[in-house]
Amino acid sequence: MKRILALVLSVLMVLCLFAGCGKDEEKSPDAPDVNGDGLNKNEVVNGPINPLTGEKVSEDNSDLRPYCVMINNHPDARPSVGLSQASIIYEALAEGGITRMMAVFNDVDGITVGSLRSARPYYISMAQAYDAIYIHAGGSEQAYSDIKTLGIDNMDGVRGARSGEASSYYRDQTRLSQGKNVEHTLFADGSKLASFCKNNYELKHDSSYDNTYG
């Protein structure tokens, strides 16, 4: 009798096991779609897109050159200003174990950016890849040599001598009053940067330039 009962129980357990495996688990309506089943993987974005990020935008500006701005990332220079408006931000070691950033903007008109720092050759190479206008405050001698040799369109807040160039930069008086070192206090008025570039440089890409997206 015990053997028969054990056999019956074993059969019932096997049947329950198969029944559980054969039934799809019901998804909670609030559960996240971890498999991405709700995504339209074949969706095509119609209309203009940000040439730097691929995101959909209201106005097509893919023919406009971006601005690459050198940003101070020393702890004493924080918080930085304007980074939230950038499409791309590069960060790399400069010297002394401190990193420096280069923010890539579709447009700088109407924003404040800073604090600003000097040019470095590897950042110049990055900016050149975007056919960008390079915004900096000073630079190493090699950086100045590369800017001249490569013909980089740039604005310099230290040696810039053209009308409207150096005046686009200013020292933040609040930071100075807080006792911050002067190299952590230089900012730029984006509207003045844009105005200077409009008067001195071609703002549109050459027809041969190939955008990242498009």
Please provide the spans of the model-predicted regions.
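Positively charged n-region of N-terminal signal peptides that target proteins for export
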Residues: 1-8
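Bacterial signal peptide processing site
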Residues: 22-24
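Alpha-helical transmembrane segments
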Residues: 8-15
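Catalytic/regulatory signature loops of cyclic-dinucleotide turnover enzymes
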Residues: 27
